[in-house]
Amino acid sequence: MENYDCNQSAERVLMDASRKKNQNRNRLLFIVITITVGVIFSVFSLIYGKMEIDIQKNMKADGMAVSTYIENGTADMTQQLTQLPCIESIGKEKFAGKLLDDSIKYCDCVITDVTGFEKMIRPAFTNVVGTYPEKENEIMLSTKTLQYLGIKNPEVGMEIELDFYWNDIFNTSGTGMQNFLLSGYFTEYQNQTSGASVAFISEKSMEKNGLQWEPCRILIDHTKKYSSGSQIEHMLTNNIKLNEGQRIVSMNPAEYRAISEMMGSYGFAVFFSVMVLLSMFLFIYNILNISLEKDLQRYGLLQVIGVEQKQNIKVMNREMLKIGLTGSIAGAVLGGMFIWGIMPLLLEKMYAENTWKLERMVFFQPKLLILAIVLVIFTLGVAVECLKRKMRKLSPLECMKYTEAVTYHKSRKKPKIKKFRCWGKHPEIYLAKKYLFRNKKTFGITSLSLWLGCELALCSAVIVNGVDLQN
C-alpha cells in the first residue's frame, strides 16, 4: 500500500485492480480482437481486390467498360436517355470502316467521341501509348494489328501504309491504299483467339468524306452496376421509346458478373457473411465466458462491501473499450502488413498470371478497415452485454456464490436419487462425460463455434479454388 494514491477516484481504483486481476484474460482478449480485426480486414480487402480484378478482367474481355448500348441510335434517343436519373454518362461509337489485306478484313475502324473513348473504351485497354486521333490522316492501332503488319517496335508519329475502306460501299471518298500517321497504340484483350482487331480514326476524317454520326451505337454508363442485363434492359424499355430498327443490347455488367463468379449468388454471399460474424461473436463470447464465474463472484463481493452496480458496469465498459480500441489498432497494423506486403503478390499469382499483367491497384480501403473495427467492437459489446445481463439478474449474494451449474429457477419436484453406476476399468470415461455435459449451454456454444470454424474453412477453400483462373 506504499504506492497507493488516496486522491484517486473509486472508478480508477477499481479499474487498476480489475486490470491487475484479469491480466491473462485481457491479454488473451487483446490477441483475439487483434487477430479478428486483422483477419476480417484482410478477408474484406481480399474479396475487394479479387472483385476489382474480376471487373477489370470482364471489361477487357468485353472490349469496353460499359455493358449496355443501343444500336442505330439518334440524337433524339440521346436526349431521352439524359433525362433518366440512373444514367451517368452517354458516349457515341460508330463502326465506320475497315482495313483490308487482299480483300480480307483484319481490322474494324471505329470513331468515338471523347466521352465514349476516355470513360467507356479506354479502361478496357492496357499499355495505352499516345492519344486518340485528331487529324484526318491519323489512326490508333492495337498491338495485335501492328504485329499483323510486321511492326514490332511502333513509334507515335510513324507513317503506315494501309488499305482502308468505308463500311458504306457507296462512299468511295478517301478509300484505298493511303498513308496514315500512328497517333497511338494499345493492347486489347477482346477476342484474343481471333485475328480480328479494332482501330480508331478521327472524327474529322468522317466529316471530310461526307459521313454523319447518325445512326450510331449509343454507349450507356448507368448506376445499376449490380443488376443483371435483363433487368437493365427491362428498365430502359419501359422508360424510352424505340424507333424502328433500334434495339437495346444489355449484357450483365462486369461488377454483377464479378460477384456471381466469386460467390455464386447474393444469397450465398449474405450467408457467408453471417457465418463469419457469428463465428467471431462466439469466439469472443467464449473468451469472456472463461472468466465469467470469477468475474461475477468478484463483482458480487464488491457490491456487498458497498460498490454500486453501475460503478462495476462502468469499470467493465471502460476496460473492454480500452481492450477493443488497442486490439483494433493492432489488428489494423496486422491487416495492413498483409494487404501491402502479401496480397498484391497473392492476387497476381493466383488470379492474373495467365490473363494479363496486374496493373497498379489500391487494395487498402479505409472504409473496409472502419467496417471491420465497427463489427468487432459491436460484437464485443454484445458479448459484454450478456455478462452484464447476468450481473443485473443476480443479487450480490447470488453473484458471490455463482457457479456454472447455478439454476435460476429451482424445481419443486423432489430430486431423484440416482443409483451408483460402476464403469469398471474405465472411470475416466464417466468423469469426462460428466465434465463435458456439466453445462449444456457452454457445451452447445463451443460445439457450434467449432462447427462454424470448420464450415468457414471449407467454404473458403471452395471459394478460393472456384475463383482461381488457373483452374
Q: What annotation goes with each model-predicted range?
A:
Residues 22, 282-324:
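Interfacial "coupling" helices/loops that link adjacent transmembrane helices in transporter permeases
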Residues 48-259, 465, 469-471:
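Basic-flanked hydrophobic alpha-helices used for secretion and membrane insertion
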Residues 9-15, 287-288, 365-409, 428, ...:
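C-terminal membrane-exit region of the final transmembrane helix in multipass inner-membrane proteins
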